[in-house]
UniProtKB/Swiss-Prot annotation:
It is a multi-pass membrane protein. It comes from Alternaria alternata. Glycans are attached at residue 77. SMART domains: TLC. One of its GO terms (biological process) is ceramide biosynthetic process. Keywords: Glycoprotein, Membrane, Transferase, Transmembrane, Transmembrane helix. Belongs to the sphingosine N-acyltransferase family. Pfam families: TRAM_LAG1_CLN8. This is Sphingosine N-acyltransferase-like protein ALT7.
Length: 432
Protein backbone atom coordinates (compact mmCIF):
# COMPACT_ATOMS: atom_id res chain seq x y z
CA UNK A 1 0.00 0.00 0.00
CA UNK A 2 1.42 3.34 1.07
CA UNK A 3 5.85 2.16 1.34
CA UNK A 4 14.51 1.05 1.87
CA UNK A 5 16.45 3.81 0.87
CA UNK A 6 19.39 1.79 -0.28
CA UNK A 7 21.18 4.26 1.97
CA UNK A 8 18.75 3.87 4.87
CA UNK A 9 18.80 1.00 7.37
CA UNK A 10 16.34 1.55 10.22
CA UNK A 11 17.67 1.16 13.74
CA UNK A 12 14.79 -0.79 15.25
CA UNK A 13 13.99 0.47 18.70
CA UNK A 14 16.79 3.04 18.83
CA UNK A 15 17.36 6.65 17.86
CA UNK A 16 19.80 7.39 15.08
CA UNK A 17 22.72 9.69 14.69
CA UNK A 18 23.11 11.86 11.62
CA UNK A 19 26.81 11.02 11.43
CA UNK A 20 26.61 7.33 10.59
CA UNK A 21 29.25 5.43 8.69
CA UNK A 22 28.47 3.82 5.35
CA UNK A 23 29.68 0.60 3.77
CA UNK A 24 29.99 0.30 0.02
CA UNK A 25 28.47 -2.88 -1.39
CA UNK A 26 28.45 -3.10 -5.17
CA UNK A 27 25.95 -0.68 -6.64
CA UNK A 28 24.59 0.68 -3.38
CA UNK A 29 25.61 1.80 0.09
CA UNK A 30 24.44 0.49 3.42
CA UNK A 31 24.31 3.04 6.22
CA UNK A 32 25.35 1.82 9.66
CA UNK A 33 22.90 3.44 12.06
CA UNK A 34 24.02 4.00 15.63
CA UNK A 35 22.23 5.07 18.76
CA UNK A 36 23.09 8.21 20.77
CA UNK A 37 26.01 6.48 22.48
CA UNK A 38 27.57 5.65 19.12
CA UNK A 39 27.14 1.90 19.68
CA UNK A 40 25.32 -0.14 17.06
CA UNK A 41 22.42 -2.07 18.59
CA UNK A 42 21.96 -5.80 17.78
CA UNK A 43 18.80 -5.16 15.68
CA UNK A 44 20.68 -2.50 13.73
CA UNK A 45 23.61 -4.85 13.16
CA UNK A 46 21.30 -7.59 11.92
CA UNK A 47 19.43 -5.19 9.60
CA UNK A 48 22.69 -4.00 8.07
CA UNK A 49 24.03 -7.54 7.63
CA UNK A 50 20.76 -8.84 6.16
CA UNK A 51 20.41 -5.99 3.71
CA UNK A 52 23.99 -6.39 2.46
CA UNK A 53 23.56 -10.10 1.74
CA UNK A 54 19.80 -10.45 1.17
CA UNK A 55 20.15 -11.42 -2.49
CA UNK A 56 22.71 -14.17 -1.88
CA UNK A 57 20.84 -15.48 1.16
CA UNK A 58 17.53 -15.52 -0.69
CA UNK A 59 18.83 -17.14 -3.87
CA UNK A 60 20.80 -19.76 -1.94
CA UNK A 61 17.78 -20.69 0.14
CA UNK A 62 15.57 -20.65 -2.92
CA UNK A 63 17.77 -23.13 -4.78
CA UNK A 64 17.49 -25.56 -1.87
CA UNK A 65 13.72 -25.18 -1.84
CA UNK A 66 13.49 -25.70 -5.60
CA UNK A 67 15.31 -29.00 -5.16
CA UNK A 68 12.65 -30.01 -2.61
CA UNK A 69 9.60 -28.74 -4.48
CA UNK A 70 9.91 -28.49 -8.25
CA UNK A 71 6.15 -28.08 -8.67
CA UNK A 72 3.01 -27.30 -6.70
CA UNK A 73 2.23 -30.06 -4.16
CA UNK A 74 -0.91 -32.25 -4.13
CA UNK A 75 -1.54 -32.68 -7.84
CA UNK A 76 -4.38 -35.03 -8.83
CA UNK A 77 -3.47 -36.88 -12.05
CA UNK A 78 -7.07 -37.94 -12.67
CA UNK A 79 -8.78 -34.54 -12.53
CA UNK A 80 -5.74 -32.44 -13.41
CA UNK A 81 -6.39 -30.19 -10.40
CA UNK A 82 -4.78 -29.55 -7.03
CA UNK A 83 -5.83 -29.98 -3.40
CA UNK A 84 -4.52 -28.63 -0.09
CA UNK A 85 -2.12 -30.14 2.44
CA UNK A 86 0.73 -29.57 4.87
CA UNK A 87 3.39 -29.45 2.15
CA UNK A 88 1.84 -26.16 1.03
CA UNK A 89 3.56 -24.56 4.03
CA UNK A 90 6.97 -25.23 2.51
CA UNK A 91 5.81 -23.75 -0.80
CA UNK A 92 4.63 -20.61 1.02
CA UNK A 93 8.01 -20.29 2.74
CA UNK A 94 9.76 -20.63 -0.60
CA UNK A 95 7.51 -17.84 -1.89
CA UNK A 96 8.61 -15.55 0.94
CA UNK A 97 12.25 -16.23 0.04
CA UNK A 98 11.49 -15.70 -3.64
CA UNK A 99 9.87 -12.30 -3.07
CA UNK A 100 12.79 -11.22 -0.88
CA UNK A 101 15.21 -11.98 -3.71
CA UNK A 102 13.02 -10.50 -6.45
CA UNK A 103 12.44 -7.32 -4.47
CA UNK A 104 16.13 -6.75 -3.86
CA UNK A 105 17.15 -7.63 -7.43
CA UNK A 106 14.49 -5.47 -9.07
CA UNK A 107 15.22 -2.49 -6.81
CA UNK A 108 18.99 -2.60 -7.21
CA UNK A 109 19.50 -3.77 -10.79
CA UNK A 110 16.33 -2.57 -12.54
CA UNK A 111 14.59 0.28 -10.76
CA UNK A 112 17.64 2.11 -9.40
CA UNK A 113 19.29 2.40 -12.87
CA UNK A 114 15.91 3.46 -14.24
CA UNK A 115 15.65 6.13 -11.56
CA UNK A 116 19.10 7.48 -12.47
CA UNK A 117 18.17 7.47 -16.15
CA UNK A 118 15.02 9.47 -15.38
CA UNK A 119 16.91 12.00 -13.26
CA UNK A 120 15.47 11.01 -9.88
CA UNK A 121 17.69 12.43 -7.16
CA UNK A 122 19.46 10.12 -4.76
CA UNK A 123 17.43 11.32 -1.77
CA UNK A 124 14.25 10.11 -3.50
CA UNK A 125 15.70 7.04 -5.21
CA UNK A 126 14.79 4.58 -2.47
CA UNK A 127 11.16 5.63 -2.41
CA UNK A 128 11.11 5.40 -6.21
CA UNK A 129 12.47 1.84 -6.18
CA UNK A 130 10.04 0.82 -3.42
CA UNK A 131 7.02 2.09 -5.29
CA UNK A 132 8.32 0.69 -8.58
CA UNK A 133 8.52 -2.78 -7.06
CA UNK A 134 4.96 -2.45 -5.77
CA UNK A 135 3.70 -1.38 -9.19
CA UNK A 136 5.35 -4.45 -10.73
CA UNK A 137 4.01 -6.87 -8.12
CA UNK A 138 0.47 -5.56 -7.76
CA UNK A 139 0.03 -5.11 -11.52
CA UNK A 140 1.07 -8.71 -12.18
CA UNK A 141 -1.07 -10.20 -9.44
CA UNK A 142 -4.09 -7.98 -10.08
CA UNK A 143 -4.01 -9.02 -13.75
CA UNK A 144 -3.69 -12.69 -12.78
CA UNK A 145 -6.47 -12.39 -10.22
CA UNK A 146 -8.81 -10.70 -12.70
CA UNK A 147 -8.07 -13.42 -15.26
CA UNK A 148 -9.01 -16.10 -12.72
CA UNK A 149 -12.12 -14.17 -11.69
CA UNK A 150 -13.29 -13.44 -15.24
CA UNK A 151 -12.95 -17.08 -16.31
CA UNK A 152 -14.70 -18.45 -13.22
CA UNK A 153 -18.32 -19.36 -12.56
CA UNK A 154 -18.59 -16.60 -9.92
CA UNK A 155 -17.73 -13.65 -12.20
CA UNK A 156 -20.09 -10.78 -11.20
CA UNK A 157 -22.10 -13.24 -9.08
CA UNK A 158 -22.00 -12.96 -5.27
CA UNK A 159 -24.12 -16.10 -4.90
CA UNK A 160 -21.50 -18.01 -6.87
CA UNK A 161 -18.76 -16.72 -4.56
CA UNK A 162 -20.24 -18.65 -1.62
CA UNK A 163 -21.66 -21.68 -3.45
CA UNK A 164 -19.99 -25.07 -3.84
CA UNK A 165 -18.59 -25.30 -0.29
CA UNK A 166 -16.35 -27.12 0.36
CA UNK A 167 -14.60 -26.71 -3.00
CA UNK A 168 -11.69 -29.05 -2.39
CA UNK A 169 -9.96 -28.90 -5.80
CA UNK A 170 -8.58 -25.93 -7.72
CA UNK A 171 -6.53 -25.21 -10.82
CA UNK A 172 -2.78 -24.87 -10.64
CA UNK A 173 -3.03 -21.17 -11.54
CA UNK A 174 -5.46 -20.50 -8.70
CA UNK A 175 -3.37 -22.39 -6.17
CA UNK A 176 -0.10 -20.75 -7.20
CA UNK A 177 -1.74 -17.30 -7.26
CA UNK A 178 -3.25 -17.69 -3.80
CA UNK A 179 -0.20 -19.17 -2.09
CA UNK A 180 2.10 -16.55 -3.62
CA UNK A 181 -0.24 -13.78 -2.49
CA UNK A 182 -0.01 -15.16 1.04
CA UNK A 183 3.79 -15.39 0.73
CA UNK A 184 3.96 -11.75 -0.42
CA UNK A 185 2.02 -10.40 2.55
CA UNK A 186 4.04 -12.51 4.99
CA UNK A 187 7.17 -11.03 3.41
CA UNK A 188 5.66 -7.55 3.79
CA UNK A 189 5.58 -8.08 7.57
CA UNK A 190 9.37 -8.38 7.40
CA UNK A 191 9.73 -5.46 4.97
CA UNK A 192 7.72 -3.01 7.07
CA UNK A 193 10.13 -3.64 9.96
CA UNK A 194 13.20 -3.05 7.77
CA UNK A 195 11.97 0.17 6.21
CA UNK A 196 12.28 3.51 7.93
CA UNK A 197 9.42 3.82 10.42
CA UNK A 198 6.47 5.95 9.32
CA UNK A 199 3.64 7.53 11.27
CA UNK A 200 1.25 4.71 10.37
CA UNK A 201 3.69 1.88 11.13
CA UNK A 202 1.32 0.24 13.63
CA UNK A 203 -1.56 0.38 11.15
CA UNK A 204 0.59 -1.06 8.38
CA UNK A 205 1.84 -3.92 10.55
CA UNK A 206 -1.70 -4.66 11.74
CA UNK A 207 -2.95 -4.62 8.14
CA UNK A 208 -0.27 -7.08 6.99
CA UNK A 209 -0.98 -9.42 9.92
CA UNK A 210 -4.76 -9.42 9.36
CA UNK A 211 -4.35 -9.86 5.60
CA UNK A 212 -1.99 -12.81 6.12
CA UNK A 213 -4.39 -14.45 8.59
CA UNK A 214 -7.33 -13.97 6.21
CA UNK A 215 -5.43 -15.42 3.26
CA UNK A 216 -4.15 -18.41 5.24
CA UNK A 217 -7.49 -19.29 6.83
CA UNK A 218 -9.59 -18.70 3.69
CA UNK A 219 -7.23 -21.00 1.78
CA UNK A 220 -7.39 -23.77 4.36
CA UNK A 221 -11.19 -23.34 4.74
CA UNK A 222 -12.01 -23.69 1.02
CA UNK A 223 -12.90 -20.02 0.54
CA UNK A 224 -10.45 -19.02 -2.19
CA UNK A 225 -13.26 -17.64 -4.36
CA UNK A 226 -14.19 -14.83 -2.00
CA UNK A 227 -10.49 -14.31 -1.32
CA UNK A 228 -9.86 -13.84 -5.03
CA UNK A 229 -12.66 -11.26 -5.26
CA UNK A 230 -11.33 -9.20 -2.34
CA UNK A 231 -7.74 -9.35 -3.62
CA UNK A 232 -8.88 -8.02 -7.00
CA UNK A 233 -10.65 -5.12 -5.27
CA UNK A 234 -7.68 -4.05 -3.18
CA UNK A 235 -4.80 -4.74 -5.60
CA UNK A 236 -5.95 -2.27 -8.26
CA UNK A 237 -6.00 0.50 -5.65
CA UNK A 238 -2.43 -0.36 -4.62
CA UNK A 239 -1.31 -0.18 -8.26
CA UNK A 240 -2.77 3.30 -8.72
CA UNK A 241 -1.34 4.62 -5.45
CA UNK A 242 2.19 3.39 -6.17
CA UNK A 243 1.99 4.73 -9.74
CA UNK A 244 0.96 8.17 -8.47
CA UNK A 245 3.95 8.15 -6.11
CA UNK A 246 6.28 7.30 -9.02
CA UNK A 247 4.98 10.30 -10.96
CA UNK A 248 5.68 12.52 -7.96
CA UNK A 249 9.26 11.29 -7.62
CA UNK A 250 9.78 11.88 -11.36
CA UNK A 251 8.70 15.50 -10.87
CA UNK A 252 5.45 15.22 -12.87
CA UNK A 253 3.32 16.98 -10.26
CA UNK A 254 0.28 17.62 -12.47
CA UNK A 255 0.21 14.00 -13.68
CA UNK A 256 0.65 12.92 -10.06
CA UNK A 257 -2.39 14.99 -9.03
CA UNK A 258 -4.50 13.46 -11.82
CA UNK A 259 -3.36 9.93 -10.90
CA UNK A 260 -4.14 10.69 -7.26
CA UNK A 261 -7.71 11.68 -8.14
CA UNK A 262 -8.16 8.41 -10.05
CA UNK A 263 -6.68 6.57 -7.08
CA UNK A 264 -9.08 8.32 -4.68
CA UNK A 265 -12.10 7.37 -6.80
CA UNK A 266 -10.95 3.74 -7.03
CA UNK A 267 -10.34 3.67 -3.27
CA UNK A 268 -13.86 4.85 -2.48
CA UNK A 269 -15.53 2.49 -4.96
CA UNK A 270 -13.43 -0.63 -4.32
CA UNK A 271 -12.62 -0.40 -0.61
CA UNK A 272 -15.68 1.33 0.81
CA UNK A 273 -18.25 0.24 -1.76
CA UNK A 274 -17.68 -3.16 -3.30
CA UNK A 275 -15.64 -4.41 -0.33
CA UNK A 276 -18.51 -3.65 2.06
CA UNK A 277 -20.91 -5.30 -0.40
CA UNK A 278 -18.92 -8.53 -0.04
CA UNK A 279 -19.05 -8.16 3.76
CA UNK A 280 -22.82 -7.57 3.60
CA UNK A 281 -23.25 -10.75 1.57
CA UNK A 282 -22.14 -12.68 4.65
CA UNK A 283 -25.44 -11.64 6.24
CA UNK A 284 -27.72 -11.80 3.21
CA UNK A 285 -26.41 -14.52 0.88
CA UNK A 286 -24.14 -16.82 2.89
CA UNK A 287 -26.86 -18.28 5.22
CA UNK A 288 -28.95 -19.46 2.25
CA UNK A 289 -26.20 -20.59 -0.12
CA UNK A 290 -23.99 -22.15 2.55
CA UNK A 291 -26.19 -23.22 5.51
CA UNK A 292 -24.72 -24.21 8.86
CA UNK A 293 -23.77 -27.86 9.20
CA UNK A 294 -21.07 -30.38 8.34
CA UNK A 295 -20.05 -31.38 4.82
CA UNK A 296 -18.18 -34.20 3.12
CA UNK A 297 -15.09 -32.64 1.54
CA UNK A 298 -15.01 -35.25 -1.24
CA UNK A 299 -18.63 -35.16 -2.44
CA UNK A 300 -19.66 -31.79 -0.99
CA UNK A 301 -22.84 -33.34 0.47
CA UNK A 302 -24.20 -32.15 3.79
CA UNK A 303 -23.89 -34.83 6.48
CA UNK A 304 -26.95 -35.50 8.61
CA UNK A 305 -25.13 -37.44 11.34
CA UNK A 306 -23.33 -34.29 12.52
CA UNK A 307 -24.81 -31.33 14.46
CA UNK A 308 -27.16 -29.29 12.27
CA UNK A 309 -25.65 -26.02 13.50
CA UNK A 310 -22.09 -27.10 12.66
CA UNK A 311 -20.98 -27.21 16.29
CA UNK A 312 -18.96 -24.45 17.93
CA UNK A 313 -15.37 -25.18 16.90
CA UNK A 314 -13.44 -22.55 14.93
CA UNK A 315 -9.76 -23.37 14.42
CA UNK A 316 -10.38 -27.12 14.33
CA UNK A 317 -12.68 -26.66 11.33
CA UNK A 318 -10.75 -23.86 9.65
CA UNK A 319 -7.59 -25.99 9.64
CA UNK A 320 -9.37 -29.19 8.61
CA UNK A 321 -7.57 -29.37 5.24
CA UNK A 322 -4.24 -29.70 7.09
CA UNK A 323 -5.49 -31.60 10.12
CA UNK A 324 -7.70 -34.22 8.45
CA UNK A 325 -7.52 -34.09 4.63
CA UNK A 326 -10.56 -35.74 3.08
CA UNK A 327 -12.49 -35.73 6.35
CA UNK A 328 -15.70 -33.82 7.12
CA UNK A 329 -15.63 -30.05 7.63
CA UNK A 330 -18.24 -28.00 9.49
CA UNK A 331 -19.49 -24.43 9.13
CA UNK A 332 -21.09 -22.59 12.05
CA UNK A 333 -21.99 -19.06 13.09
CA UNK A 334 -18.80 -18.58 15.10
CA UNK A 335 -16.66 -19.18 12.01
CA UNK A 336 -18.74 -16.71 10.01
CA UNK A 337 -18.40 -14.04 12.70
CA UNK A 338 -14.64 -14.66 12.97
CA UNK A 339 -14.10 -14.04 9.26
CA UNK A 340 -16.40 -11.02 9.32
CA UNK A 341 -14.51 -9.59 12.30
CA UNK A 342 -11.21 -9.76 10.40
CA UNK A 343 -12.77 -8.15 7.32
CA UNK A 344 -14.25 -5.36 9.44
CA UNK A 345 -10.85 -4.88 11.09
CA UNK A 346 -9.36 -4.21 7.66
CA UNK A 347 -12.21 -1.79 6.92
CA UNK A 348 -11.41 0.18 10.09
CA UNK A 349 -7.77 0.50 9.00
CA UNK A 350 -8.87 1.61 5.54
CA UNK A 351 -11.10 4.27 7.10
CA UNK A 352 -8.11 5.60 9.05
CA UNK A 353 -6.13 5.79 5.83
CA UNK A 354 -9.08 7.41 4.10
CA UNK A 355 -8.79 10.28 6.56
CA UNK A 356 -5.15 10.75 5.54
CA UNK A 357 -6.09 10.51 1.86
CA UNK A 358 -8.76 13.18 2.21
CA UNK A 359 -6.17 15.54 3.71
CA UNK A 360 -4.05 15.05 0.60
CA UNK A 361 -7.12 15.52 -1.59
CA UNK A 362 -7.80 18.84 0.12
CA UNK A 363 -4.24 19.97 -0.72
CA UNK A 364 -4.72 18.93 -4.34
CA UNK A 365 -7.93 20.91 -4.68
CA UNK A 366 -6.20 23.88 -3.03
CA UNK A 367 -3.50 23.67 -5.71
CA UNK A 368 -0.73 22.56 -3.34
CA UNK A 369 -0.15 19.16 -5.01
CA UNK A 370 -0.47 15.61 -3.73
CA UNK A 371 1.90 14.55 -0.96
CA UNK A 372 1.73 11.50 1.31
CA UNK A 373 0.74 12.80 4.76
CA UNK A 374 2.25 9.71 6.37
CA UNK A 375 5.68 10.61 5.06
CA UNK A 376 6.19 14.05 6.56
CA UNK A 377 9.18 12.76 8.49
CA UNK A 378 10.34 9.91 6.27
CA UNK A 379 13.34 11.96 5.10
CA UNK A 380 14.11 13.20 8.62
CA UNK A 381 17.35 11.24 8.53
CA UNK A 382 18.57 13.90 6.11
CA UNK A 383 17.35 16.78 8.26
CA UNK A 384 14.57 17.98 5.94
CA UNK A 385 11.51 19.77 7.25
CA UNK A 386 7.97 19.06 6.06
CA UNK A 387 7.84 22.07 3.75
CA UNK A 388 11.35 21.52 2.48
CA UNK A 389 10.61 17.86 1.71
CA UNK A 390 7.44 18.77 -0.21
CA UNK A 391 9.18 21.44 -2.26
CA UNK A 392 12.13 19.22 -2.98
CA UNK A 393 9.93 16.25 -3.91
CA UNK A 394 7.90 18.31 -6.37
CA UNK A 395 11.02 19.72 -8.04
CA UNK A 396 13.28 16.67 -8.00
CA UNK A 397 14.59 17.42 -11.47
CA UNK A 398 15.41 21.11 -10.83
CA UNK A 399 19.24 21.50 -10.71
CA UNK A 400 19.04 24.82 -8.84
CA UNK A 401 16.88 23.32 -6.11
CA UNK A 402 19.23 20.34 -5.87
CA UNK A 403 22.34 22.56 -5.49
CA UNK A 404 20.67 24.68 -2.82
CA UNK A 405 19.45 21.61 -0.99
CA UNK A 406 22.85 19.87 -1.04
CA UNK A 407 24.66 23.03 0.09
CA UNK A 408 22.33 23.51 3.05
CA UNK A 409 22.70 19.86 4.06
CA UNK A 410 26.50 20.02 3.86
CA UNK A 411 26.52 23.07 6.12
CA UNK A 412 24.32 21.32 8.68
CA UNK A 413 26.47 18.17 8.64
CA UNK A 414 29.69 20.20 9.10
CA UNK A 415 28.20 21.96 12.12
CA UNK A 416 27.00 18.66 13.56
CA UNK A 417 30.44 17.09 13.05
CA UNK A 418 32.13 20.00 14.83
CA UNK A 419 29.68 19.82 17.74
CA UNK A 420 30.11 16.07 18.07
CA UNK A 421 33.90 16.38 17.95
CA UNK A 422 33.81 19.00 20.70
CA UNK A 423 31.53 16.78 22.79
CA UNK A 424 33.87 13.78 22.42
CA UNK A 425 36.91 15.87 23.45
CA UNK A 426 35.07 17.06 26.54
CA UNK A 427 34.18 13.47 27.44
CA UNK A 428 37.86 12.41 27.14
CA UNK A 429 38.96 15.28 29.39
CA UNK A 430 36.34 14.33 31.97
CA UNK A 431 37.50 10.70 31.87
CA UNK A 432 41.10 11.79 32.64
Amino acid sequence: MFRPDLDDIPALGSETSSLDNTVENGNYRVKLWRDKSGIRSPPSTFCTWFKQYQIGLSLGSLLLLILMFTCLPYYDNVSGTYTRGRDDLAFIFSGVVLFTALRAISMIYLLEPLARLCGVHKKLMVRFTEQGWLVIHHSLFWTTGMYINYNSEYWMDLDGVWSGFPERTMTGLTKGYYLLQLAFWLQQIVVVNFEKRRKDYSQMLTHHLITSVLLATSYSYYQTKVGNVILCLVDIVDVLFAFAKLLKYLGFQYACDVAFCVFLASWLVARHGLYLLVCWSIFTILPTVMPYGCYDTISGNRLSEFPADGGNEIMREVLQAFRDPGGPVCFNSRIGWAFLGLLVGLQVLMLIWLGMILKVAYKVFQGEGADDTRSDSEESGYGTSDHEGDCYGAQAGNPKVIRQFVASREKVHIEQAENQGLHLRQQKRSAR
